[in-house]
């Protein structure tokens, strides 16, 4: 780990393979090496720095890291330490504008005592984290929608099965005399109206009128001629 001081007074740290810093940092790395390696503390740029007055964030962009890693093998990105005041001003500027113009970038760099490139990289990292957070929220929302739609699909499938069962099964017809359901063998379908009715025997033949009824005098009495004629 090599340390350097920028013209603005900020300390820049850069990891170099095969070298380690002296003092307490070197002792900390040695202790960590005994446990499995020396790892730098990762900080969330969305949250203020905790436990200290400074915050670190990668200086280089993703493209730069890939180029340096391809040329010189494994590479650890450089870190820039920001104070709480600098982090607060950067967050306020990001809430106002997610993208800065060259003039805004230059003015903010002068105000924060940073280089314009450092401000640009910070905004790139901040936009990437915002996009990642938004993607996670959209993924969670789509998962909930998928679950509700799956449950609705199952409910509709159950309703379809119930309707099919009702369509196949014969309808229940009650007897007009006993009010009990008639068996399926006793049901017939009217060919004209296609309605299921209870099976009945042949139509009853009406008895002919009796002879007594035929011989009964008619209640109509014709008018007799008058005696005057």
From Swiss-Prot:
Q: Which residue ranges does the record annotate as region Disordered?
A: 1-82, 198-229
Renumbered to this chain, the Acidic residues biased-composition regions fall at: 52-68
Q: Does the keyword Nucleus apply?
A: yes
One GO CC annotation:
nucleus
Q: Which compartment or compartments is the protein found in?
A: Nucleus
Binding region for DNA: 75-134
Expression across tissues? Expressed in seedlings, roots, leaves, nodes, internodes, flowers and embryo.
What's the superkingdom here?
Answer: Eukaryota
Checking SMART domains in the record gives:
HALZ (SM00340), HOX (SM00389)
Q: Which UniProt keywords apply?
A: DNA-binding, Homeobox, Nucleus, Transcription, Transcription regulation
Please give the SUPFAM superfamilies that the UniProt record associates with this protein: Homeodomain-like
Residue numbers spanned by region Leucine-zipper: 133-177
Annotated GO molecular function terms are: DNA-binding transcription factor activity, RNA polymerase II-specific; sequence-specific DNA binding
Q: Which Pfam families match?
A: HALZ (PF02183), Homeodomain (PF00046)
The family database entries (CDD domains) matched by this protein are listed as: homeodomain
Q: Which family does it belong to?
A: Belongs to the HD-ZIP homeobox family. Class II subfamily.
Q: Which PANTHER family match?
A: HOMEOBOX-LEUCINE ZIPPER PROTEIN ATHB-17, HOMEOBOX-LEUCINE ZIPPER PROTEIN HAT14
**What does this protein's UniProt record list under function?**
Probable transcription repressor that binds to the DNA sequence 5'-CAAT[GC]ATTG-3'.
The subunit field of the Swiss-Prot or TrEMBL record says: Homodimer. May form a heterodimer with HOX1, HOX2 or HOX7.
State the protein's name.
Homeobox-leucine zipper protein HOX3
């Amino acid at each position: 780990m090599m340390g350097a001081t920028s013209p603005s007074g900020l300390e820049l740290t850069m990891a170099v393979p095969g070298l380690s810093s002296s003092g307490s940092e070197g002792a900390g790395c040695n202790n960590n090496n005994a446990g499995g390696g020396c790892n730098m503390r990762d900080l969330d740029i969305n949250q203020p720095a905790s436990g200290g007055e400074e915050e670190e964030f990668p200086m280089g962009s993703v493209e730069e890291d890939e180029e340096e890693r391809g040329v010189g093998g494994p590479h650890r990105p450089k870190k820039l330490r920001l104070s709480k005041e600098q982090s607060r001003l950067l967050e306020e500027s990001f809430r106002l504008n997610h993208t800065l113009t060259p003039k805004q970038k230059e003015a903010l760099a002068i105000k924060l005592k940073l280089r314009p490139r450092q401000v640009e990289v910070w905004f790139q990292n901040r936009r990437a984290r915002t996009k990642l957070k938004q993607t996670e929220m959209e993924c969670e929302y789509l998962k909930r929608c998928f679950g509700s739609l799956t449950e609705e699909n199952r409910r509709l499938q159950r309703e379809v099965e119930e309707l099919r069962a009702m369509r196949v099964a014969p309808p229940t017809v009650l007897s007009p005399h006993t009010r009990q359901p008639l068996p399926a063998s006793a049901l017939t379908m009217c060919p004209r109206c296609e309605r299921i009715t209870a099976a009945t025997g042949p139509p009853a033949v009406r008895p002919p009128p009796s002879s007594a009824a035929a011989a009964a005098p008619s209640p109509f009495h014709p008018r007799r001629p008058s005696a005057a004629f």
